[in-house]
Amino acid sequence: MRGDLYRAAIILHHELVPNPATFFSITPVISPRFFSALPLPRPCTPGTAFNVGEAVARHLQVLRFAGGEVITLFDGAGGEFSATVENISKRDATVKLNRFDPVEREAPIRITLVQALATADKMDLIIQKSVELGVTDIAPIATARATLKLDGERAEKRVLHWRAIAVAACEQCGRNRVPVVHGVQTLDQWLKSVRGQSVLLQPLAEKSLLGSVDATKPIALLIGPEGGFTSEEITRAVAHGVIPAKFGPRTLRTETAGLAAIAALGACFGDLV
């Protein structure tokens, strides 16, 4: 009974949609994953005690862990650690490190999502799902028709919020390297930093997305806001070497376009098969 409640709590906490077989002995239960803001020791000596800090301790309390449960820790530097929970207090928890696994689950195709600011709920969705799909970087940009206006302290707080979403998405999907969520820039600021191949999704473009990229090189994918890019913005982007490309015959919403394009690139050139 306790095992059933434990698995249900993990599923709810991490918003998982598992295969029903995970509830039976056919498939082993995956231990819950937590991001450690504190660097984990390398090399890992089995039996080493490690203090996981307040954030992880709070999660363990919410899940009603009492000690003895096995969890997975990662710190963003690659690989993951199996650990056994030993002591939990209100502001801290101690685990015993069991072993280090150098496993990586990064996509073979490197994609930077350059996303024009959208409404708050849409941005949260875009950040979460793009991390799950395998992007390596996310660059939020302010554009003429963006509905979300951010500057100064509001922008800094929102970026911290997005970074927390990226961490939570990595905990859920199994990634051991957290994608970089950059600070908010204007379109022109971002264009000045353009290096390598960059593609702007534009319904009226002549070339297709898949026919415009070299998947062996990093790709920057530029997605417009709810109202789209202005003609002046597209002209400036093209002048900086950005390639307009179409993605199917339909005009997609800003929260759909980037995610669908990332999934298509991952299916054709990456590991989404």
Task: Identify the meaning behind each predicted range.
Residues 5, 10-102, 153:
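N-terminal positively charged helical leader segments and presequences
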Residues 61, 131-134, 238:
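Non-catalytic positions within long, well-ordered alpha-helices that form the structural scaffold/packing
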Residues 101, 226-227, 249-252:
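Short, acidic/turn-prone active-site loops that include or flank metal/cofactor-
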